[in-house]
């Protein structure tokens, strides 16, 4: 929690701009290409990581296919996995998340830009 506060405080001048831009892209998803939306999210992600004094190191990025799809299986229950993967992944991707986090401010807009799939974990027919 402290790290998130540090991230916001170090980017306090940019937070209103990023928030407005994120809301605009989320409201007009179909007006932007997947690459444009991903570039905007990467810009916000990079600023957040830099503000939190985080240095993300990656290995094997050259093995990520640029077409025909791929699946990442992060093994952490927190929400930081997506930020770390987004920092280093060269191609746009989406996420599958539980529907409960789909109404959390900020995550709601990020998921809209990513065209994330929200699932109900109680409904086994999904």
Region spans (language model):
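A transmembrane-helix-recognition feature enriched in membrane-embedded lipid enzymes
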Residues: 1-57, 109-110
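Soluble catalytic domains of membrane acyltransferases
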Residues: 55-126
């Amino acid at each position: 929690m402290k790290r998130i506060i540090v991230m916001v405080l170090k980017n306090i001048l940019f937070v209103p701009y990023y928030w407005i831009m994120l809301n605009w892209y989320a409201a007009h998803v179909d007006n932007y290409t997947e690459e444009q939306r991903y570039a905007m999210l990467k810009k916000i992600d990079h600023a957040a990581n830099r503000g939190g004094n985080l240095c993300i190191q990656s290995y094997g990025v050259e093995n990520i296919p640029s077409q025909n799809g791929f699946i990442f299986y992060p093994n952490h229950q927190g929400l930081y996995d997506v930020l770390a993967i987004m920092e280093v992944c060269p191609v746009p991707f989406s996420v599958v998340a539980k529907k409960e986090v789909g109404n959390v401010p900020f995550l709601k807009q990020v998921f809209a830009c990513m065209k994330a799939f929200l699932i109900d974990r109680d409904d086994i027919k999904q």
